[in-house]
Design a protein with these regions (language model features):
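C-terminal catalytic and target-recognition region of SAM-dependent MTase-like enzymes
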Residues: 241, 255-304
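S-adenosyl-L-methionine
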Residues: 169-211
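Conserved class I S-adenosyl-L-methionine
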Residues: 136-142
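Helix-to-beta-strand junctions that scaffold the AdoMet/dcAdoMet cofactor pocket
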Residues: 250-251
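Conserved SAM-binding loop of SAM-dependent methyltransferases across substrates and taxa
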Residues: 146-158
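Non-catalytic substrate-recognition/targeting regions of SAM-dependent transferases
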Residues: 52-120, 128
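Mobile active-site "lid"/loop adjacent to the S-adenosyl-L-methionine
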Residues: 170, 193, 214-244
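Conserved SAM-binding motif I beta-strand of class I
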Residues: 160-165
Length: 304
């Protein structure tokens, strides 16, 4: 499957086979089903092999419940980020890549190479909202990662979509995702390699009126210490400046969606620029399968 149209056709045929009680469908689906299991480091002393043993047992339990083989469970470990240290550990040596379909869009994912897979499922509602509201609008996707918001904006009929990220790897991935969904116009769908903090500061100071945006997505990492830039991002500290510069880039009645997965960020509306109104959209943006978690917070900031 190489594009969204083929994906839709495949799913339609699969559903027809299910409706016809084709006995081979379930086994085929199981062959394509994978799960990622994360172990978050526990804050107490333990035997050296305790975590690996526990993770293996949980992986087998997950495989039994999902009806898949144990080698389809990708095991990973997360440790808290401390200062400039960012730690990850992966237990699989297999290369597991492919495409997934979400709300009629198709995305390339990689379950094995990186700690994250390329698509954050907790933001499905916001992606759908972007698609609903992007029609004929200029859209800016900051810290774009693999470009999922950009795909939804393009599908929603945006007149222009710019995706900004410092990583060549993720920008290339984002381009692939746009192409998978049929969006390849280089003038309409622009990819910018830049340090977002620096780019925003310079761009917002001199932006022409006809280059401003109607919709901006600001979904930064909590912390970033890239070798490609001297800037160190700490969203708990830097969010007011980022939001202020985003607002400078908005057209009147334009909207900024600011999201963070930091539980320590202290959001204060008094630090927002003048002539803005803000609503906390967190509860409306968390899907049912993430209820009860602190997966992210989301604010809608409108310039009037």
């Amino acid at each position: 499957i190489h594009n969204a149209k083929q994906c839709v056709e495949f799913i339609q045929k699969q559903n027809e086979r299910i409706a016809a009680n084709d006995a081979t469908v379930e086994s085929e689906i199981a062959e394509r089903r994978f799960a990622v299991l994360y172990l978050y480091e526990r804050p107490y002393k333990k035997a050296e092999d305790e975590e690996e043993l526990w993770l293996s047992e949980m992986a087998q339990a997950a495989a039994d419940v999902l009806g898949i083989s144990a080698d389809h469970i990708v095991k990973k470990e997360r440790k808290p980020q401390k200062g400039a240290n960012q730690y990850e550990k992966k237990y699989t040596k297999n290369i597991i890549k492919g495409n997934v379909q979400e709300q009629n869009q198709i995305f390339r994912i990689d379950l094995s190479t990186y700690l994250d897979t390329g698509l954050f499922f907790d933001h499905r509602p916001l992606r759908a909202k972007i698609r609903e509201n992007a029609g004929k609008k200029r859209v800016l996707n900051l810290f774009c990662y693999t470009g999922s918001f950009s795909v939804y904006a393009a599908e929603g009929g945006a007149s222009y979509v710019e995706s900004v990220d410092l990583s060549n790897t993720y920008l290339s991935w984002a381009k692939d995702n746009l192409r998978l969904n049929g969006f390849s116009d280089a003038e309409k769908y622009v990819f910018t390699k830049a340090d977002v903090i620096e780019w925003l500061e310079k761009k917002s100071a001199h932006i022409q009126e006809d280059k401003k945006f109607d919709l901006i997505i600001l979904d930064p990492p909590t912390f970033s210490n890239s070798k490609s830039t001297e800037n160190i991002l700490d969203i708990n500290r830097d969010w007011p400046v980022l939001v202020e510069n985003c607002v400078k880039m908005l057209n009147p009645n334009g909207t900024l969606y600011f999201s963070t997965n930091s539980t320590k960020l202290s959001f204060d509306e008094s630090k927002l620029p003048k002539n803005t109104e803000c609503t906390d959209e967190t509860q409306n943006s968390i899907p049912k399968d993430f209820e009860g978690t602190k997966c992210h917070r989301l604010w809608k900031i409108r310039l009037y």
